């Protein structure tokens, strides 16, 4: 779970998180997001996700929006047939809530790994924590951008900056006051603590 209080109108946060081009500008987890033509058998729009890892290696995946209530929440699922991806499939939800200080933006997600016991070990030792903190880093980039820092996206695309942040968080350094924050699992959620059930609801749609 990752959340941030963004000092900006919900309309701006919605636009920059829902538009694929703007999404890539702040989310370090992806290098390309694009709508695909056509829909799946359930009528959901398909999206192509790409992540450049290193030395020309790219991981590919497909996303689907399951349900969207403008300016409030959107649920999605994702999967990858790319053998390089630890993630096999997963689901999540983005939540938007207007607060006195701006917009409370939150995501809850989970996924299934591939490669059996080896995948489970890699996920437990490294990947799940990496994905959690990459999401936290990205939410903080969005928060800074929406707060008026127009260079936040370009500055924070640096892998070196992220690795320094990642190492610091692994060593126990807390997020800066007011910055995006994250947790693994449930039990420490904040004011939107009743919302994790929304992910379960989306699975039954």
Question: Which residues make up each language-model segment?
Answer:
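A conserved amphipathic terminal alpha-helix motif
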Residues: 111-179
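A short, structured loop/turn motif at beta-sheet edges
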Residues: 7-11, 38-42, 66-73, 95-104, ...
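Hydrophobic pocket/interface hotspot
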Residues: 12-17, 23, 47, 65, ...
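Hydrophobic/aromatic beta-strand elements that line small-molecule binding cavities or substrate pockets
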Residues: 2-4, 33-36, 51, 60-67, ...
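Short beta-strand segments that buttress and anchor functional surface loops
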Residues: 45-54, 76-83
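A generic structural signal for short beta-strands and their flanking turns/coil linkers
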Residues: 29-31, 41-45, 59-63, 70-76, ...
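Beta-strand/loop substructures that line and gate deep hydrophobic ligand-binding cavities in soluble
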Residues: 79-136
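Hydrophobic ligand-binding cavity/cleft-lining segments
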Residues: 1-43, 157, 161-205
